[in-house]
Amino acid sequence: AALFIGIAPGYISRSVAGSYDNEAIAIFLLLFTFYLWVRSVRDGSMLFGMLTALSYFYMVAAWGGYVFITNMIPLHALVLVLMGRFSERLYVAYSSFYAIGTLASMQIPFVGFQPVRTSEHMAALGVFGLLQLIALTETVRRYVSSAQFKVLVRASVAILALAAFAALVALTYAGYIAPWTGRFYSLWDTSYAKKHIPIIASVSEHQPPAWSTYFLDLH
């Protein structure tokens, strides 16, 4: 992947040191944040979790594409949980990253309260809550019998899931949480921007490239 991205003209033109565009620093920060995240999960280090948050904060200040990190790291954490790989290391890494990173990102003027008031950021908040619930469950497991634990978990999960879903729907309809933006709908329907947001569709980087572009870029 590094080889291909290193010789792609579209990437080189935007990421060269001293470039005028945001991507000159943002692409590096994007990859560096993911690197620090992997280190924090591997080591279970709060220090690396904090460094991940600081790198994320710099990314937020540099480029609006920070939302990609905001959703990819929670997705990775969720996949680990679904695979049965929840651990104290994951809990420490994600909790330190999310708490510090979110508070830091809210200091950027154009972001403000978006991390708690837009649908684009709800996945990160949801995974944070899920990890707290799992950690609490693991603690309770030590003090109750197996039968009581199963009943308690099933009841708690059902109630909390319904409550969280109802709260999300209610707050969205009430206008407290903004709906998904057009660029996210464009991920599922590539013609969405062309139909509904012409100004976004007019930007060349938002248009799907022709297959010949991949061949020409690498020759």
Locate the predicted segments by residue.
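Perimembrane helix-loop-helix junctions
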Residues: 69-158
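Membrane-interface anchor segments at the N-terminal boundary of transmembrane helices
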Residues: 212-219
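Membrane-lumen/periplasm interface segments of specific transmembrane helices
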Residues: 63, 100-115, 162-179
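Aromatic-rich transmembrane-lumenal/periplasmic boundary elements in polytopic membrane proteins
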Residues: 146-211
